[in-house]
Amino acid sequence: MAVMDAEPATTGPAGLIARLREKLTGGSSEASLTRRLAGTIFVIRVISAGLAYFSQVLLARWMGTSDYGVYVYVWTWVLLLGSMMDFGISASAQKIIPEYRARGEHALLRGFLSGSRWLTFAVSALVSLGLAGLVKLLSPWIEPAEELPLYIGCMTLPAFVVANTQDGIARSHDWMQLGLMPQFIIRQALIIGITACAFLLGYHLGAVAAMIASAGAVWIAMTGQMVVLNRKLAGHIEPGPKAYDVSGWLAVSLPILLVESFYLLLSYTDVLVLQQFRPSDEVGVYFAVVKTLALVSFIHYAMSATTAHRFAEYNASGDKARLSAYVAHAINWTFWPSLAATIVLLALGKPLLWLFGPQFVVGYDIMFVAAIGLVVRSAIGPVERLLNMLGQQKICALAYALAFAMNLVLCIALVPHFGGHGAAAATSISLSFETVLLFWIVRQRLGLHVLAFGK
């Protein structure tokens, strides 16, 4: 069965529009389904980006650059740790659930759908208590303005982790809206609503108030997502006994956790190192630049979220030609939209940064440095998901570890002297290095060409 849809030989404006509509929504093949799901995810992420951008603009203007910088620093820790504390189960769900379904192991499937969430909640709650104790222990060396926001961040983590796990479960059933909307739209809307109410009521909107609003938004969104997910699962899977293969889950998840952890460390090292060497207001400017370019990474995220469980299915069926065509399709639909989005964002960079405040426009030239790495990385598409789903988690984790180590060394070397420019340069160089490594690994291990151009 062909993976790619045939293109009608229509010409003229009407024909071009028809072909574009067919490209995006037509057909019944896996490629068409992937485009529709990826389009859904991309729309959700774009709306989320708009809400997040709006909320960050409001917070930056209401809080000032210094308080905003503290909030950004603490929230970055929440994003980093919260995304690592699920053992990789949110990602491995896209491998485990399709395999259980294919093998008819319904008891194990039911056990995973409930047990994975209880497991991640219990462990993340214990780890959060330990982290709060660590903050208390290190309080003499922590800036006073950061201490209370860090405690609030610890309280946020369990809900954040469970939401990630539920996202993975929902995506494995192709319920993209349920997986993503609570985290990326409802949560952002709640943050805007809570902080706006506090501001209008005359409360001082500092880093503490912003973190309280963010924590409340995370818990509310996660709880609502849990209620809806449980109802959908009840109608999708027949009741019956549950079996729990925790060791088997962890055997799949922990190598993926290594990949995800090094990816996250690579993503957030620049902000965390910048906070150690530069003033909080400079961190705020750099974060505004990163937020402005976030649309580019959303395209990669959309394709990753829709293709991972397909990679696992096609590999299990043994159809390498089908897998190869699907991989090429995913790469093309990652790179070319990413390139177009980068060009548009760079063209509109100054007015977008000005929305945060006139003082944020100084970060415009940093955008060009940061954009290089994003475009280079998009040229190989979601190959990290391909490696994870095809049992190459360890070598993929090694590639990310090397890229993270390079990024950390470069950030420490460049940030003290060049600030945000140095952080952006370090990240772009590291992303380019990671791209070369992943391309070579897939070529050697899987024999697949994973570049948007050439053979």
Model feature map: region roles:
Residues L16-T34, Y203-M211, G224-S267, R310, ...:
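Interhelical loop/hinge segments that connect adjacent transmembrane helices in multipass membrane
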Residues R36-S48, V74, F87-K136, L148, ...:
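Membrane-water interface segments that mark the loop-to-transmembrane alpha-helix transition
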Residues F87-A102, S172, V289, L293-G318, ...:
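Helix-loop junctions and terminal segments of transmembrane helices
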Residues Y151, M181-L233, L402-M406, G420-Q444:
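Hydrophobic alpha-helical transmembrane segments
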Residues F160-Q183, I372-A399:
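Membrane-interface junctions at transmembrane-helix termini in multi-pass inner-membrane proteins
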